[in-house]
């Protein structure tokens, strides 16, 4: 009897230690997993930031930080969606007055959106301005479904077009830029896309400087704060999701020279804009200016010249005031979860 009891105690202790060992191993595995996950998160967080500045005229690269690192483009995706619309217009597959049907799926997209009604229609023209200004996700889906039959198929067409344009590290999974782990691009690729639109669709590129758009009595303002506040800015687009941070592709032309700047992973819209301005200011200094017309000295003018007008008398005292940069401090997303 005693021997059996001792055996039972030994078996119990053995099982207890075994259970402890299993729990201990599970704990170690859990800690290891958490550490590994943290390292991945840190790596991903650090990889968010990227920037790229290029002179479109000379193709000279002025700045490159993580320009080929894949990041989430967010609503910069809509630049390609717009490129696809411009292609369709160019090849007369649609016109500005063509009406796109609105599906239930499109209306279910999260903000930023126009709050479209299923079963109704929206013109190509309104779709373009809604994408440029409001960055409407529901409109992006409408465009995809009408031009590509389905958003999934449209995304494949977008990726194919990207490769054709030289965007070698870009993959699209949707037309809006809404969160998708497989939707990736780079700062360099987005600069390539911006230049491609201006080269292949110059008249449509001008639409990117639209500051506001009215649809059904509601005014929507462009998210690109550099428009009207930073001299020479004429496009192109912002993007934001929690995973991507605040992104921006900017186009600025001065003295006949155009610079394209790209920033990925800004912490705030305001700090992203300030950083972009800092990059552009720095590299505009290296851009050669067009020669200015020299004003002749009075001794060089003809003796029998007519008397100077009031305007001519004041030319020598004329100076251009410096451009004051005043970026809007409003960064509230409100109902705009993904812009």
Question: Which role fits each region the language model picked out?
Answer:
Residues 24-26, 75, 269-272:
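Short alpha-helical segments used as structural interaction elements across diverse proteins
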Residues 1-50, 54-57, 62, 95, ...:
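N-terminal secretory targeting signals
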Residues 32, 39, 45, 92-94, ...:
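A generic structural signal for short, solvent-exposed coil/turn residues
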Residues 23, 35-39, 45, 58, ...:
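Short secondary-structure boundary micro-motifs
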Residues 45-188, 195-199:
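Active-site-adjacent loops and short helices of periplasmic peptidoglycan-processing enzymes
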Residues 26, 43, 64-65, 90-95, ...:
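Solvent-exposed, well-ordered amphipathic alpha-helical segments
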Residues 167-171, 179-184, 188-339:
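Domain-terminus/edge residues, biased toward the C-terminal soluble/receptor-binding domains
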